[in-house]
């Protein structure tokens, strides 16, 4: 069962990305290093509710 999740930057709080994840195999919140346009560099993005 894939669900749509939003990724928010940990430094600015901006919600820059929307992706999908499989809740059965990844029940915990995902964390990815993605590009932040406001900071113009890669930062850690966490899944938000």
UniProtKB/Swiss-Prot annotation:
InterPro entries: Ribosomal_bL33, Ribosomal_bL33_CS, Ribosomal_bL33_sf, Ribosomal_zn-bd. GO terms for molecular function: structural constituent of ribosome. It comes from the Bacteria. Keywords: Ribonucleoprotein, Ribosomal protein. GO terms for cellular component: cytoplasm; ribonucleoprotein complex; ribosome. Transmembrane segments: none annotated. Pfam families: Ribosomal_L33 (PF00471). Disulfide bonds: none annotated. GO terms for biological process: translation. Gene3D superfamilies: Ribosomal protein L33. HAMAP family: Ribosomal_bL33. Belongs to the bacterial ribosomal protein bL33 family. PANTHER family: 50S RIBOSOMAL PROTEIN L33, CHLOROPLASTIC, LARGE RIBOSOMAL SUBUNIT PROTEIN BL33C. NCBIfam families: PRK00504.1, PRK00595.1, rpmG_bact. This is Large ribosomal subunit protein bL33B. It comes from Shouchella clausii (strain KSM-K16) (Alkalihalobacillus clausii).
């Amino acid at each position: 069962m894939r669900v749509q999740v939003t990724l928010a930057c940990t430094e600015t709080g901006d919600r820059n990305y929307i992706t999908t994840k499989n809740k059965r195999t990844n029940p915990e919140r995902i964390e990815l290093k993605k590009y932040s346009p406001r900071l113009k560099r890669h930062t850690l993005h966490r899944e938000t509710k």
